[in-house]
Amino acid sequence: MDTVTTNIVTTDIRLLRLLQLSSVGLPVGGFAFSQGMEYAIDQGWVKNKTEVSDWIGLQLQQSLARVDLPVLRLCMDAAKQQNTERLFELNDLVLACRETKELRLNDTAMGEALFRLMSSLQIDTPFKRLDEMSFVTLFAIAANHWGLQVDLACLGFAWSWLENQIAAATKLVPLGQTQAQELLGELQTDIRHAIAMSLNIEEERVGAGLPAIAIASALHETQYSRLFRS
């Protein structure tokens, strides 16, 4: 009976850690970036709930599934093996996959914020304060530190990203709160498919190209007025 109770408590603690790490309340600033969506909406490329779903769903399948989630898995493996050199290599890889300065800033700004938080929570990392750190890499280190399974860490990462994107769309299109919840429900299937795809992608196959999103992100810098950071 004691063993069963211990297992339940351990599982509950890990679930709570997953919720903590993937919460939109995590102070890393994910809400500050639209990842090109603001420009796309301003130009009329994305005008309604259906087009928001297409825009976000494409990124889940072609970007997160082929870059962020595979690197997250590989970083968790490296962290588990305490392979610092490998972590730095993977960190460089994911940053090299960012197609614009804005997308790279999105990743490193969130990475720097998570680094500060992890330091406060006494989670060790091999990085130093002035290093250029990917949010993906640090998320993986934190997930490994808390004993999360790879598939659950990927789920939490993707869910957090999805919530931030839909929150941005809710402000920009704009969408109603009910429509936002409908989108969260619709795109859960895309998350599941993205994770399944990512588990089969090794380092040499990491990479994706989404020209429209890269263009939107690059041109967002000179957009006349912006709600989101560039």
UniProtKB/Swiss-Prot annotation:
Top-level taxonomic group? Bacteria
User: Which InterPro entries does the entry mention?
Assistant: UreF, UreF_sf
- Predominant localisation class: cytoplasm
User: Sorted alphabetically, which keywords does the UniProt record give?
Assistant: Chaperone, Cytoplasm, Nickel insertion
UniProt cross-references to Gene3D superfamilies, sorted A to Z: Urease accessory protein UreF
Q: Name one Pfam family in it.
A: UreF
GO MF term list: nickel cation binding
Q: Which GO terms describe its cellular component?
A: cytoplasm
Q: What name appears for this protein in its UniProt entry?
A: Urease accessory protein UreF
